[in-house]
Amino acid sequence: MFFIFAFNLWQGYLVFLFYKYKQKPAVVLPKILPQNLPVVTLQLPIYNEMYVVARLLNQVTLLNYPKNKLEIQLLDDSTDQTTEIAAKIIAEMRLKGIDVQHIRRTERTGYKAGALAEGLGASKGEFLAIFDADFLPQPDFLLEMLPMFYENEKIGLVQSRWGHINEADGWLTRLQAFFLNAHFTIEHLSRKQGGGFINFNGSGGIWRKTCIIDAGGWSADTLTEDLDLSYRAQLKGWAFGYMPQVTSPAELPANINALKSQQHRWNKGAAECVRKNLLNVLKNKQIGYKTKLHAIFHLGNSSIFLCITVGAICSLPLFVLSQKFVFLHVFFRLGSFFLCGFFLLIIFFWTSYEAKPKNFLRFFCRFVGFVSVSMGLSLYNSIAVLEGYLGIKTPFVRTPKFSQNKDINPSENLYLSQKFPVFSLLEFAFALYFALGIWLSFYFKDYSLLIFYVLLCGGFGVVSLKSVFQFLNKSAT
């Protein structure tokens, strides 16, 4: 409970930093003369992406950059027809004079990190731009991003803001966009301006090659190779840039089981980075206390799910006992005070809410939905966090992509798991467990945790049933 309260306080501090630096005039970056443009390698790591690889390759042909200074690497670890689809398009690209390399590996060693390392060794560029398969690099991306590197030779990375090409698909994609917009609007900017480390988000960014090499290169010992390299580079003294005015549109998971796969990787990888990098940050005497505090809450943010899960499970028996033992009743009153930290969370998300004009009722419904579904994912994510802290290794599981092709039925996606989501049965049991909490609140006429139990019951119920129904829908097709 204390960590949840402290985390919410820190989110409030990030809002303060956001408003503090919001009025700071943006630095006007000079354009680079065409003859001075550097050689850039565009890396596209893919693995079994037959639904989106054509869209990706067609999009990168639109990049506004001299052909003699742009190298494209398709880092293709695929084992299905993705490779054949890509090969045909690459042949057409080469006929247009585009320098594109189709790099294949005999073994998928190191997963995405291994593919990026392979490409790094063969790259021609001074800078390396990286995009995942579901992204749509905008034509002027390179021309808009590269000038920041010339502000300071110690800038090792410049990250763009993510956009969402399918936000309007349904409530699940809207809630993801709700969260990601807050991350890219407030967290990145506030950490950067407030003296904290920021991170490469895995896609939509440009690295200086010498920075990657100096930091030790790509490593596959965590599932979030992007976060890991980001911290190692900044510990080496490299600075990172962020350009929120440059948007890199991408596809959001529209399937709950695909989202859970992505969330597992992100949260476990963050916990692995705590094990690997946090102590190095705290021990570094060249780093100030503000940077260290930023790192604690940045790297440790996935632990919020563990705190929610443990607190929620323990709350019900303690709630029953509190009806008999007065000292426990006082504890719950104190716990209710800590929940006031959620008001700071409301302010945090309201600040980043991008609907124009802002409608508080619509915002609040989206906020409640986000909190409830996040609680519903907390058990699944908690296991991921525990695995990360305990050093339990699991494969890098890619997030299934769906494409925006209306001729393709999402339920027919071959990359979705063929196994029944057994874990959803446990999540549904949790929904029933917290439904009991709702009933007990009325039975004891003690409503101190009623809202908490409603959010938990609704979240676990929605997540579990959505997982099962989407699986059954796929099975039926």
Located regions from the model:
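Loop-to-transmembrane boundary segments
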Residues: V52, N284-C307, Q404-A435
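Membrane-proximal soluble regions of multi-pass membrane proteins
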Residues: G269-V274, L361-N409
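Acidic donor-binding segment of Leloir-type glycosyltransferases
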Residues: N58-I103, R108
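The conserved acidic donor/metal-binding loop of glycosyltransferases
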Residues: S78, D132-L136, D221
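N-terminal signal-anchor transmembrane helix
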Residues: Y13-K69
